Amino acid sequence: MEDSTEDIIKSFTLEQSPEIKPKPKSKTSDLTDIVYAMDDDSIKMKKFTIFDDKYDQNVSDSEHDLTPIKRKRQQQPPPPQQPSKFSSSIPQKPTLSPKKLASSPTKNYTDHINQLRSGPNSPKKYQEDENVRSLKYEIKRLKQEQNLKLENLQNKIEYLTKERDELQDQLTSMSFENDKLAKKNRSLSHENNHLTLENSKLKTKEYSNEDLQLEKNKLQRMNNTLRSERDELVKDFNLTRDKLKKYYDLYLHCQKNHVNVKSQRTEVGGDKPTADNISTNEELVDILRKLSEMMIDQNKMSEPIAAIEKDKPSEDKTSSPNFDSSKDAPRIVSEFLEEFIKRIVEEMSANSKSAPSSKQHINSEMYSQPNNFSNNTMPPSQSAAYIPSNSQPAPRPAAAAAANIYSSSTPNTNGYNQSSHSNDRPNTFELPRVERDHWTDRPPSERSTQSTKYMKMDPEEIRKLVVIITDQLKKEENNEKSSNTLDSETPIEKCQCCHGNPRNVNEPTNQKLCQSCLNKGDFTMSEFMGHSN
């Protein structure tokens, strides 16, 4: 029997389960490997359940009770009671149980069976040992199964850890990309703000363009008004020139009517200078014609500049138009001619009421100094020494007063050096001799105030006018000298009185004009007005 049980146990010995190698993990792996391993373990467990069913039907596959089997003990019947009726009368001996010996069987059969079963070679003891062995095998199997499951779980944990690390790496990379996108978003927001600012600037620039357009229109209107004013000034200049021509015709008419008066003219300290009346008149006409032509040329020079400014694009006309000094020349000359005509009328009316003056006084005192009349506003071509006729001597204090008036200490501001050009000026004509009013004999309230009027003029305007006239005269003189060969039989007398320069009035040599200056035919404005009457 022992051999048979050992054969049975050997047939059901627990084989060592082969080691399960974990499959390589991948991102797509799942729990299928663990499920397959559990199925293999369940197949192996069926062998042990069959072995348990053979030897113990009370043990199930899922329940393994390691406690020993409890058996019911047979209760021995209590010893029979002796009848008590004999106790009082007859004493009884105590019952002695037989001595139990190992070799000798007991009288009770059940006890004997129990004794046999509890022995080391009893079948029950052998069965209990087999159960213990089976339990040990079961424990070993469960431990192996547990170790396998733990290994699978460990592999799964490692796989999940690796997956977690990969996800962590992806998370860090995504966080890095997120930071880059955040930076890009900030840069785009900054660029958006910049574009918004540029848009607002463009809107404001549109408004500023409208303002500039309005300003441009305003400047164009101003330019048109200035052009219209310039046209009016040119028109006034033409009218003034026509008036001057009329007054000059009147002067010629008066000169023809007073031809007989010219024969009565005498010269102090010499003979009567000879001069052709027709040539001198033509010379004055030429001077006035040259002056008018020069003004017309300046007007023509200013017109192309205005045309160029008109042809310029409107964008360049943002600033106010500027007129150069050449455009101001017609205005300056026009104002001067207007004042010149007014002065002609006033002095003609004043000279009509004049009385004869002293000849000696005029010759000796009045022309002892260069004429500073009107604060040097008249050009040198219109200043000359004049010797009136029918003059009578005047008292000395009046002559001294006249000398003080004409010997002004005001410097020469017209920019013209009379001494340097005294020998180059051509001989001017001789005017008819008429009676002249000596205005110094009148009280100051009745004297003419043209000099103070011209003293109020701007010296710059006077200088411009004088320079223009003198330059034109010098050009004409040079042309005449080069074209016409004049007879120079009589030598030209040089100026000995320092005409046109500041002098000391107290010097006796500077009290009179030299013969050269007298022969030039220079005359003052007052004398010219007196002859034109």
Curated annotation (Swiss-Prot):
It is found in: Cytoplasm, Cytoskeleton, Microtubule organizing center, Spindle pole body. The keyword Cell cycle does not apply. Residues 136-236 form a coiled coil. Residues 83-94 have a biased composition (Low complexity). One of its GO terms (biological process) is mitotic spindle pole body organization. GO terms for cellular component: cytoplasm; mitotic spindle pole body. Residues 103-121, 349-392, 405-421 have a biased composition (Polar residues). Residues 1-32, 53-130, 309-329, 349-453 are annotated as: Disordered. Keywords: Coiled coil, Cytoplasm, Cytoskeleton. Signal peptide: none annotated. Residues 18-30, 53-68, 309-318, 432-445 have a biased composition (Basic and acidic residues). The keyword Nuclease does not apply. Plays a role in mitotic spindle pole body organization, possibly at the point of spindle pole body separation. Required for mitotic exit. This is Spindle pole body protein CSA6. It comes from Candida dubliniensis (strain CD36 / ATCC MYA-646 / CBS 7987 / NCPF 3949 / NRRL Y-17841) (Yeast). The lineage of its organism: Eukaryota, Fungi, Dikarya, Ascomycota, Saccharomycotina. The gene is CSA6.
